[in-house]
Amino acid sequence: MATFAVSGLNSISSISSFNNNFRSKNSNILLSRRRILLFSFRRRRRSFSVSSVASDQKQKTKDSSSDEGFTLDVFQPDSTSVLSSIKYHAEFTPSFSPEKFELPKAYYATAESVRDTLIINWNATYEFYEKMNVKQAYYLSMEFLQGRALLNAIGNLGLTGPYADALTKLGYSLEDVARQEPDAALGNGGLGRLASCFLDSMATLNYPAWGYGLRYQYGLFKQLITKDGQEEVAENWLEMGNPWEIVRNDISYPVKFYGKVIEGADGRKEWAGGEDITAVAYDVPIPGYKTKTTINLRLWTTKLAAEAFDLYAFNNGDHAKAYEAQKKAEKICYVLYPGDESLEGKTLRLKQQYTLCSASLQDIIARFEKRSGNAVNWDQFPEKVAVQMNDTHPTLCIPELLRILMDVKGLSWKQAWEITQRTVAYTNHTVLPEALEKWSFTLLGELLPRHVEIIAMIDEELLHTILAEYGTEDLDLLQEKLNQMRILDNVEIPSSVLELLIKAEESAADVEKAADEEQEEEGKDDSKDEETEAVKAETTNEEEETEVKKVEVEDSQAKIKRIFGPHPNKPQVVHMANLCVVSGHAVNGVAEIHSEIVKDEVFNEFYKLWPEKFQNKTNGVTPRRWLSFCNPELSEIITKWTGSDDWLVNTEKLAELRKFADNEELQSEWRKAKGNNKMKIVSLIKEKTGYVVSPDAMFDVQIKRIHEYKRQLLNIFGIVYRYKKMKEMSPEERKEKFVPRVCIFGGKAFATYVQAKRIVKFITDVGETVNHDPEIGDLLKVVFVPDYNVSVAEVLIPGSELSQHISTAGMEASGTSNMKFSMNGCLLIGTLDGANVEIREEVGEDNFFLFGAQAHEIAGLRKERAEGKFVPDPRFEEVKAFIRTGVFGTYNYEELMGSLEGNEGYGRADYFLVGKDFPDYIECQDKVDEAYRDQKKWTKMSILNTAGSFKFSSDRTIHQYARDIWRIEPVELP
């Protein structure tokens, strides 16, 4: 074990002396030189800051031209300088005891060393953007699922070799050191992982862009698998600190909740009183691949301003009261997606979303003002700023931007609204109704009173647009449009709109009355006596007509209010997705089929109104992390056969593998790489679950968030059917009929999603039974890998041979794990849903195992079920009956089984069509077995999957966002 001893503190050179394993004259010289550079650099890296919108600038931004210190060419690390840097950080930025240099300490010292190099480029990138005053994109997301940073950072910097050599000299392997890093618990699933892939591509392609998120102390949760199924505990990933982040105490902004709105003498609104907290920035440098560009992920944490601490209560012994406000502030960033079943949970989620939006918008505006100098032109704001909302969580940035522009900067509503519409854009990630966020109008009004006023103004703008488009003649049609499109659902119609509707109704009534009078006039007798009588009654009629007119006006008002007024028994809600569509200049889906569903179903009325807003941007994944760094052996093979590693930034070159797909030498190398990766999975499974599996079996994997629409239940039902059939056969028949399989699951069920947690429990119960059945042996194993995260995926994906993407058609927006598996030569079985459609087109129909109903059939199939016309396949009924025998334990699965039965009712009637697709699914699995027996054919299919995955690079996606939505250009550092 490598160790070093502590000595005196008389000078820099004698602060500490390493033991004999580390001492050498050359390394001491390099260490001293490195210290000087580092100290100079550290003074300089604090030279940039931006001020709060709500307060004076905290410190002046220094002119970078006057600074001394690093330029990009000062420090070019090699293994010797890397070694000195690691030693330096082991000594001077200690997180552990000084006596021993063990693996955890080696990791932190190595990470700090890498961060030094990142910050050099990070500073240069920031300063160049400042100097050039470029248009910059800002990506707001509640999640960033980054994974481990060490291997990714040194890979992008081109320093893998020097760091591996340096750590070898210190007695460790780079891989062992990298495994000490905990995954950053800043996300959960595809939404957050996509955001992280996008940041990697933005930096690699030299686009001026930043990410904004929240710094969650405990993440979503750490998943434990026990005899009771899934259990959740806090994920304390920050316990030992995060070496990749830089706390920016010089950058903080006030964030307000509650309070009231006051109108000043000049008509400007002021949001006063309430509860104030402070959002503090933590910066994480994001390096591009083989480029100097290093962009920023700015994360916000929350605290109470010192002046708000109740010192009087504390000194009087009421410590709980004194600390109450601090706890309320801090808990905003404790947990990702806190449970929202309670009012407190809903309030906390809204506070999270608003904190992200408010702090980020204040920061963006401060940067715009700083770069504009003394000539701030707000009409130029959209020419310098693009804000992308990753799903509906950052929706509050719309009213927040309007609030700042109007209430703080003094712009008119018209000008602020135009600027906002040109600035923000919205990515839709779901067609699930429950995921299209709706918030209580009352709760939002209490928490953010000014923002509800602004949202009401946007809603009023929308209503006038709808009236202009559809007119007021057909009130039934108009009511239908408002019900589908309003932002404020079941809320009073604005008076300006109400007056128009009442006037229109009165005009219609007048026209109708005039027609009736004309008809009556034609039928009158022209006799003189009647004329005389009419003259006598004229005065009386005029008085009566006045009264009738008043009644008719009242009737018109009552009619309009009855048709368009709020219903007392319905909740008043704010539709956040509608707010995004109305306010943004672009709305995009994330796969071709999803974007069509968005236009034709989810937002069809808006699409009719503004077809030019709607776009498709099929998702992608970074080939650096998801092929090169996690699967280096396969990457070397690809580089060899394509002639260079250009495919890492130009994935179209992967398509060149197609011409070698039948080459026996390539196939042999390909199978060997896959086999080596499978051995890593064997080790992972043993470590995480205790199960021992055979590397000779097919590795069949489904790893994703546990949800009914993703249909892990269909997968495990297929496994149960397979197991039952095996049990009915002789050993010889089993071996002939079935290919050995290891069926691997991974993913988290939300803590409050009971049915998803039942599915986890069922999978683990099936595994417990099957894995201990001596008759079955290695023919079938079922494994649930606990606490699925990016690092687990980086082991499972390279060694997988079949991956399941089997969601109910039309319900998965895109998916990105399907892209990662395909890129690593894994074959897919799936429905025509999300990105599966496009993957199948690129890899070839014969190289994708397709089954199941299609998206356009789903509504009809559900209707058929509701009418009692669906007849389940006997094999599906056989599986359910087998489960009910108790073969998988004593747990009561009636609630789970019940969701698949009946024709109607909440939580019943097989809404996700497991029973409908089951027979097609198991027959498709037979085709998988047949194909796998021919390993030459299977390997060719695997190669063609990698070759066809070229389209699904996040680089392609980001180019499209930059060109079509953000309108930004690459900016390469000199």
UniProtKB/Swiss-Prot annotation:
GO terms for molecular function: glycogen phosphorylase activity; pyridoxal phosphate binding. Leaves. GO terms for biological process: glycogen catabolic process. Residues 509-551 are annotated as: Disordered. It is an enzyme of class 2 (transferase). It catalyses: [(1->4)-alpha-D-glucosyl](n) + phosphate = [(1->4)-alpha-D-glucosyl](n-1) + alpha-D-glucose 1-phosphate. Its EC number is 2.4.1.1. Its cofactor is pyridoxal 5'-phosphate. It is found in: Plastid, Chloroplast; Plastid, Amyloplast. One of its GO terms (cellular component) is chloroplast. Belongs to the glycogen phosphorylase family. This is Alpha-1,4 glucan phosphorylase L-2 isozyme, chloroplastic/amyloplastic.
